[in-house]
Each structure stands twice: as C-alpha cells, then as structure tokens.
C-alpha cells in the first residue's frame, strides 16, 4: 500500500511556508496525483487535510505553484487567519479538499444558480481526531452544504474518517444529527458568520441552508470529478492558469516523470500576532 508523507519548506506562519505531499518518497501534486477514491467500490475517498480543527491559519492547496503544495492564503501580501467567532475557535472541523476534483468556474450549477469557485471540492471531516496539514485521510461521504460565497457556489462536503469510532454508525446525513446533535447547525452557523470579523457580510446558503444527503453529495462529487478530468486533459474552456503538472498521470499533457522540490525543513512556527486569539461576538449568531 502506498504511503503518503509530507515535506515542509519554510516556517509555519510565514510567506515561505509550503507543505508538499510525497508518495513513497516521490513528490506528487496534492491537486492532481492523489486518487479521489481509495477503494475500487468508490465508497471510501481520499481527503487532503489543509486546516486542522481548532487552528486559524487559512491553509489551502496552491493552484499556481508546481505540484500544488499547501500554502497559507494571503490578501494584499498579508497572511490570512480565520478569526475566532464565539463560541468557536478557528476552524470548526478538519478542513480540506478532495483531490482530482474541480469546482468549474465556467459552469453555472442549475440549482444554486452560481458558478464554481475554481477550487478543489471542500471537505469538512467531522471525526474526533485532529488532523495535520498535508495528511491524506480516508473518509466516507455523508452529505453536502451549498455555501454561496461572494456569488460563487462553494460546496462543503460533510465526511467522516473511516477510522473514527462513529464511522460505522453514520452513513447518511440524518445519522449525523442522531449521533452528533447540533453539529450541522453549528457548521451552518460557522460558515455563515466566519468572515464577519473581517468586515464582510455573512455568507448565504442555497437550499435555505439545508444539508443535502449522501446521494446528492455523491452527485456533486461526480460532477466535480468530471470537471477535473476535463481540466487535467487540457480541454477546459478556461483553466484559470492552474498548474497542471503531475508525476503519475502519464497520459496527460503536463505529466513529468521526475520533479524536484527543495529539501525538507523542520522549522519552528513564526510567532503570530496575539490579536488572532481574540474572540469575536457576532450579533445574531446562535449557540
């Protein structure tokens, strides 16, 4: 069985920080090389953890850099941190993405009436174990929320680590409310309010905030997988400048047999401003 490991460059909380993923010691693209499905039956999926639960740094798979390492997002040259919206601290779940998926910005979804956000499909992993940036988790899908983020469709797949003690008991979205009461309501609230401390309006949801079931989520995943297949084949009407370099997909135009990345470093995190620890109290937020 293949083993995925991470290689870190630079210090966390700096502009230089990058987390590459390697498979059996060989660099791979976090976006393109890791299979979406972890088993032949397509019931278990590979999720890449970008942001561990309860942390603030807005880490994401880079669309621009070769092999798509995980980096910290920036705005106007400054590192982005998610604020603490009471009673939450940082991200409410292990947050990440499904590889080999793409929310196509050239396509308007018929039900949300909004185009894709040009990113891999987002995943909220709701198990009890806190992950780490660059971790490849095996998860099963339970449902999906449709966030409308600044006019774009931004799907949020709800999933659980297959190794979680509850994994055998939760198989669809209604099981989440049964075994984890309040989690879906809190997830909806968090995504609705988390940008307010930065001066932005609250986010909106399609379907009146309803979390759709596993069947609907599987269809969203299939659509985003097909969009990625068009992208990696070089056939997208507009690839938005995404780096498509990969080291495993030999039949694609951007395959490279060998790719070099810098030597790994194990540097201590740079200090961050104490204001990141502040709690923000949002009027109208439910607890």
Curated annotation (Swiss-Prot):
Its main location: cytoplasm. Its cofactor is Mg(2+). One of its GO terms (molecular function) is magnesium ion binding. Mg(2+) 2 binds at residue 122. GO terms for biological process: phosphate-containing compound metabolic process. Its EC number is 3.6.1.1. It is an enzyme of class 3 (hydrolase). Keywords: Cytoplasm, Hydrolase, Magnesium, Metal-binding. GO terms for cellular component: cytoplasm. It catalyses: diphosphate + H2O = 2 phosphate + H(+). InterPro entries: Pyrophosphatase, Pyrophosphatase_sf. SUPFAM superfamilies: Inorganic pyrophosphatase. Mg(2+) 1 binds at residues 117, 122, 154. The keyword Lyase does not apply. Diphosphate binds at residue 80. It is found in: Cytoplasm. PANTHER family: INORGANIC PYROPHOSPHATASE. Belongs to the PPase family. This is Inorganic pyrophosphatase. The gene is IPP1.
